[in-house]
Amino acid sequence: MSETINVKIITPLNIVFEEQAKMITLPGEEGEFGVLQGHAPMIVSLKAGLLKVYIDDMHKPKITYLIANGVTEVTGSYINIATETAINITDLSEAEIENKLTALQKSI
């Protein structure tokens, strides 16, 4: 059994991310949750917040996205995330992240 899950992040404009990951954490309406390979199937509403992709190390995210509202479909081997917006904030400064967050909140 593989230790990775296939991840696809989709916005209305394009596929933002499509790769395998060890774990994903997402901002669900009921709170933050994580998904690993083999997770039980589910469909969950997402709220605006941070989506973290753990590719090599399960203790440190490799990529972090600021997302708007959306929905995710999880099966044991893949996760599809459909969101209004997904902004890669991995390499941004704290001030740049605050600016992106403020702009996102105003657009919602």
Swiss-Prot record:
GO CC terms of this entry: plasma membrane; proton-transporting ATP synthase complex
Domain of life of the source: Bacteria
InterPro entries: ATP_synth_F1_dsu/esu (IPR001469), ATP_synth_F1_dsu/esu_N (IPR020546), ATPsynth_dsu/esu_N (IPR036771)
Keywords: ATP synthesis, Cell inner membrane, Cell membrane, CF(1), Hydrogen ion transport, Ion transport, Membrane, Transport
Sample GO molecular function, one term: proton-transporting ATP synthase activity, rotational mechanism
Pfam families found in the cross-reference section: ATP-synt_DE_N (PF02823)
Coarse class of the protein's main subcellular location: membrane
Membrane topology: Peripheral membrane protein
Subcellular location: Cell inner membrane
Role noted for this protein: Produces ATP from ADP in the presence of a proton gradient across the membrane.
Oligomeric and partner information: F-type ATPases have 2 components, CF(1) - the catalytic core - and CF(0) - the membrane proton channel. CF(1) has five subunits: alpha(3), beta(3), gamma(1), delta(1), epsilon(1). CF(0) has three main subunits: a, b and c.
Membership in a protein family: Belongs to the ATPase epsilon chain family.
Descriptive protein name: ATP synthase epsilon chain
Taxonomic lineage from the root: Bacteria, Pseudomonadati, Pseudomonadota, Alphaproteobacteria, Rickettsiales
Name of the gene this protein is made from: atpC
